[in-house]
């Protein structure tokens, strides 16, 4: 199971999944904060 087209030894789909999860999490926190009122100061 040697993936040649990967950056280092981490598969690209793992990087994509982690990046997508982080982006969705940040957007969720930002929108939640804006609804509560804490995000208005940002």
Swiss-Prot record:
It is found in: Plastid, Chloroplast thylakoid membrane. GO terms for cellular component: chloroplast thylakoid membrane; photosystem II reaction center. The chain crosses the membrane at residues 10-30. Its main location: plastid. InterPro entries: PSII_PsbJ, PSII_PsbJ_sf. Pfam families: PsbJ. One of its GO terms (biological process) is photosynthesis. Keywords: Chloroplast, Membrane, Photosynthesis, Photosystem II, Plastid, Reaction center, Thylakoid, Transmembrane, Transmembrane helix. It is a single-pass membrane protein. The keyword Transmembrane helix applies. PSII is composed of 1 copy each of membrane proteins PsbA, PsbB, PsbC, PsbD, PsbE, PsbF, PsbH, PsbI, PsbJ, PsbK, PsbL, PsbM, PsbT, PsbX, PsbY, PsbZ, Psb30/Ycf12, at least 3 peripheral proteins of the oxygen-evolving complex and a large number of cofactors. It forms dimeric complexes. Belongs to the PsbJ family. HAMAP family: PSII_PsbJ. One of the components of the core complex of photosystem II (PSII). PSII is a light-driven water:plastoquinone oxidoreductase that uses light energy to abstract electrons from H(2)O, generating O(2) and a proton gradient subsequently used for ATP formation. It consists of a core antenna complex that captures photons, and an electron transfer chain that converts photonic excitation into a charge separation. This is Photosystem II reaction center protein J. It comes from Chaetosphaeridium globosum. The lineage of its organism: Eukaryota, Viridiplantae, Streptophyta, Coleochaetophyceae, Coleochaetales.
């Amino acid at each position: 199971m040697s993936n040649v087209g990967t950056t280092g030894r981490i598969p690209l789909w793992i990087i994509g999944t982690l990046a997508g999860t982080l982006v969705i999490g940040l957007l969720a926190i930002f929108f939640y904060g804006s609804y509560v009122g804490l995000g208005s100061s940002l």
